[in-house]
Structures are given as C-alpha cells and as structure tokens.
C-alpha cells in the first residue's frame, strides 16, 4: 500500500485552514483563489484518527465527478484540477498535488451544514427511537431502521470548529442565522442536488442514504463548495442488498465507525490507533464507491 499523506507542507503557499481532511492554501498574487488539498486523514466522531493511503485522491475524483454532473443545478467553486494550469507558485509541489487537489474560487462559506436525508439511519434513527419528532419533522410511527422517507428531508446543522460537534438546528433557527429567503434557497438547492445524485447513483447500484453539502457565496451568489457526495460526507449503501429493518452494507465510513464503537473509547482525543486490517478494509469500501459511481 502506498504511503499516506497525513500532513501537507508547501512553503511557497500560505496555509489558511487545516480541517479534518482538507488543507486550504492561499496563493501569493491570487487573492480570489484557494488551493484545496485532500489529505489521507480520516476522522470519526469529529476526531482525526489516522490516514487511509490514497483516500484523498478518491475524495477528489468523486467530487470532480459530481461537480460536473450537478453543474446545471448550481454553480460550484472549481476552477481546475489540472496541476499544469495552477499558478506558478504551485509548480514545485505538482507531484504531491496531482490527483488530490483542486484550484477553487475563494468564497464566503455559509455557516450551515446542509444535510439531506433520503433514508432514516445513523444519529437520526437513534433520535427517532426516542421521539418521533426529530429535527422539527413529525415522522410517522413504526418506521424501521433504513426505511426510505416519502420525500428527502433537509436537516441543517451548525458548522462546528475542529474538535467540536455540529449541532442540529431547526429550519426556523436557520432562517434566523442566514435570513428567510436565503434559507429557502439553501434548502431548495440542497434537495435538488441530493435528488439528482440519488437518482443517478441508483442506476449504478448505490443508494445515497444521506449526505452533507457545503455552500458558499461569491459576488452575492450561492455556489457549491468543498467536497461533494464522497464516502466521507455521505452514506452509500449497496442497492442489491438493501433490506430495511437493520443497518446496511455500505461503501463509506460506517465500517470504521462500527469498529470504533466496539472499542472501549469515549470518542474524545486521543484516538486509538487503527489496525492495518481496518485501514485496508476501509480503503476497499472507498475504492468500491468510486468504481461503482464513476465506472473508473
């Protein structure tokens, strides 16, 4: 297995943000652009764990695929992923950047995580077991784990700092944060993106149970930013093995989450080391996601 990229170091560029997975660099002389670099770091429960070799390239490949497929719904921040077209300051790092980076427009990120759910799973399922009113949605009684909702639902959350937890908020609270008109626009865009992607993925044998979009503003216009519909930001299930009433076979981080849940770990840093077997099997799930969805 190839060596993983856990950290980045590009002295001629200016690191402006290091997230759970991505590092964002400003480029001297190009104030309207940023370089987004996907490392191989992997996180769960808002804790950075370790690295999955090649993961950053998988996330980048999928994001580029979805940016293209969804471009007629909303513009996105991508300028190019061809390292030969990057500004000159990036040239010394071309080999490190190839396949895992995107030159993007600098935007003002909206302070909302745009989550769309087509199926009941994960934390939403756990909350439903306690109360059928979840995130402001009154759901019918008697739903099973992994059941499909009649229509996709939009459940926003706050955007927490690294190490903190995102907090689910009501649509009304979101309206207070961004304004009524903008909130309606964000929800409409998010659901349209999910519906298009879910319909496409189903033709490839993949169910997108839920996903998280990030939106930003540039010149007063809302655009799609960050990563899009990857195994880090989504739940991907095998359509041919879908069976409501239980958790599903997936091509995402759920295998890793399940492993961590089996440990005596309080889900706070420091994270336990990941055995090689867990790293290899997680990588295999990510590989299958990109192969099924893109055909490559």
UniProtKB/Swiss-Prot annotation:
Q: Which GO terms describe its cellular component?
A: cytoplasm
EC id: 6.3.2.6
**GO BP annotations, alphabetical order:** 'de novo' IMP biosynthetic process
The molecular function GO annotations come to:
ATP binding; phosphoribosylaminoimidazolesuccinocarboxamide synthase activity
Cysteine-cysteine disulfides: none
Q: Which HAMAP family match?
A: SAICAR_synth
Q: Which organism is it from?
A: Desulfotalea psychrophila (strain LSv54 / DSM 12343)
tRNA processing as a keyword of this entry, yes or no, is no
Q: Please give the catalytic activity noted in the UniProt record.
A: 5-amino-1-(5-phospho-D-ribosyl)imidazole-4-carboxylate + L-aspartate + ATP = (2S)-2-[5-amino-1-(5-phospho-beta-D-ribosyl)imidazole-4-carboxamido]succinate + ADP + phosphate + 2 H(+)
Domain of life here? Bacteria
Q: Per its UniProt entry, what is the enzyme's top EC class, as one word?
A: ligase
UniProt keyword annotations, A-Z: ATP-binding, Ligase, Nucleotide-binding, Purine biosynthesis
**Pathway(s) the chain acts in:** Purine metabolism; IMP biosynthesis via de novo pathway; 5-amino-1-(5-phospho-D-ribosyl)imidazole-4-carboxamide from 5-amino-1-(5-phospho-D-ribosyl)imidazole-4-carboxylate: step 1/2
Give the protein name, as stated in the record.
Answer: Phosphoribosylaminoimidazole-succinocarboxamide synthase
Q: Which family does it belong to?
A: Belongs to the SAICAR synthetase family.
